[in-house]
Amino acid sequence: MKICIQGLGFVGSAMGVAASLSKNKVVGIEQPTQEGKKIIESINKGIFPFKTNDKALKKNLKILSKKNLLKASHLNSHYEDADVIIVSINCDLKRKNNEQKINLDSFKKAIKQFAVKIKEETLVIIESTVPPGTCKEIIYPLIYNSFIKRKLDPKKFYLAHSYERVMPGKFYLSSITNNWRVYSGINNVSAKKCRNFFKNSTDDFNW
């Protein structure tokens, strides 16, 4: 199974390690910015790109990198043969008149990057914290319309949401692999596939 992690921030990078522990091939995708290139280079060297005192996280990343089970890239072409895509990117917050409002423009742009690439039967899991209705009103239509334009069956992609649950610290990796997950799907099939993914394709998830 090939898994793509979109967004290699503090959570996405750790999720990449967690997902590859069960010998899945994982590719983390990050933007080719100056910071993004540093993250990509670090992961491909087997070094966690952020400060952490979790020895298990650092050790496993080094091992997985050497085994070519986990790598990082800026190429969107990796989405083309992915079986699962995990979205782990931030939504922009903008302050106006002393109020914070969420701007989803960059988030939608990120979704479009893989929506035009993925194949039928791909499972998309949103780990990002998003406003209620985002999956149904924004993400699902973007992928659906892309499938129509590409003459693919719009019923043959699966969308689920399972928000990130992490506890940074010396047991950071364990907090990902040994924590209860809450999940929901755009339909029953998507929900079932999401559950099966976390249950069978990652290391020691609880349900």
Q: Where on the chain are the PLM-derived regions?
A:
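Internal alpha-helical scaffold of NAD(P)-dependent oxidoreductase catalytic cores
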Residues: S22, P141-S162, V166-W207
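Structural alpha-helical scaffold elements that stabilize or flank donor/cofactor-binding regions
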Residues: S77-Y79, K117, S175
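Rossmann-like NAD(P)(H) cofactor-binding subdomain of soluble oxidoreductases
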Residues: L93-R165
